[in-house]
Amino acid sequence: MHIGVPLETQTGETRVAATPETIKKLIGQGHKVTVQSGAGIKASVVDSAYETAGATIGSANDAFGAELILKVVAPSDSELALIKSGTVLVGMLNPFSNETIAKLAEHGITAFALEAAPRTSRAQSLDVLSSQANIAGYKAVLLAAHHYPRFMPMLMTAAGTVKAARVLILGAGVAGLQAIATAKRLGAVIEASDVRPAVKEQIESLGAKFVDVPYETDEERECAVGVGGYARPMPTSWMQRQALAVHERAKQADIVITTALIPGRKAPTLLSADTVAQMKPGSVVIDLAAAQGGNCPLTVADQVVVENGVIICGPTNLAGAVAADASALYARNLLDFLKLVFTKEGQFEINLEDDIVAACLMCRDGQVIRKNA
């Protein structure tokens, strides 16, 4: 099959959907691969590296004219115009955007959005959300350290002792846990909160203190369990108690990193404007939910703002700041997914009996398969 790897043109996107490592494996399976010239430059992969792996370097028309296209994000309108009806598209296509999926269906594209893969052990190797969130959690701490006007670790010097930074992490999914681990390596004192009681042990195993907000009703306990590894919206009663606990700890914190997301919904508010107003001058907030509205109402996507002396950062693509490794991990995720849609003979086949394939299939034959509420 002819596989195309175009240059990502979305503003700020630095990643590429295939690396020489994964392309070599695809060619070894009998496929032909065309990479758009310059596609990997921002991820530290030059055209000659792709050629050495066996790929052909071509234009945007060449890459988008392939039978199967590997992308990082959904194609723009101008890119859609280059894609033929019947083409297969695989990438992070925003499965919760009805408008995006409808456009792909109108163009006759067979689209697979890997964000929709189930959170099961079998799907771990192609879990793009986890591979990219892991990087975002790491980079969030480094971004916080960059803006924080003090040291992170405790230092004892001849000029006196410097206290360790106090870090509060809200949301202990993949990004949150990596943020805990990274902040710990930098010598910070860490507290972390999450709606799911099951992560308490994980938080403590990384050296952080769990901010415990007890459940008072069966409804609260049921919602806290989550669905498919994701958090669910919590009842108002619990959110009010959690907000109070966060408020008190945020006032003492030097750095707050928020990571809470709910698939297909606006990000929950975890850090109120009133809380920010009472935080210490010079403290830093890194809002990893900025792309979905933010966990703090003062967050502005892709900007750094200062409110009452508090520095608030709203990055929407932190994984892209580590483009080389983010691309390498993402490309491996795609490669593992392609194993599910190619037969041993290298023929493309959609097996809807496979729960991963069925979950990721957004549209085919002009019809939207996944419909969001």
Predicted feature locations:
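Glycine/threonine-rich flexible loop motifs
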Residues: 12-17, 78-83, 91, 229, ...
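Glycine/serine-rich phosphate-binding loop and adjoining beta1-alpha1 elements at the start
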Residues: 2, 8, 75-166
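Rossmann-fold NAD(P)-binding glycine/threonine-rich loop
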Residues: 95-123, 265-319
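Glycine-rich phosphate/diphosphate-binding loop of Rossmann-like nucleotide-binding domains
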Residues: 6-41, 45, 153-249
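Adenosine-phosphate binding glycine-rich loop
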Residues: 121-159, 290, 296-373
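An N-terminal-biased, well-structured beta-alpha scaffold segment characteristic
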Residues: 2-103, 107
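A structured beta-alpha segment of the ubiquitous adenosine-cofactor-binding alpha/beta core
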Residues: 54-64, 74-75, 221-256, 260-273, ...
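Generic hydrophobic/aromatic pocket-lining and core-packing "Φ" positions
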Residues: 23, 47, 80, 101, ...
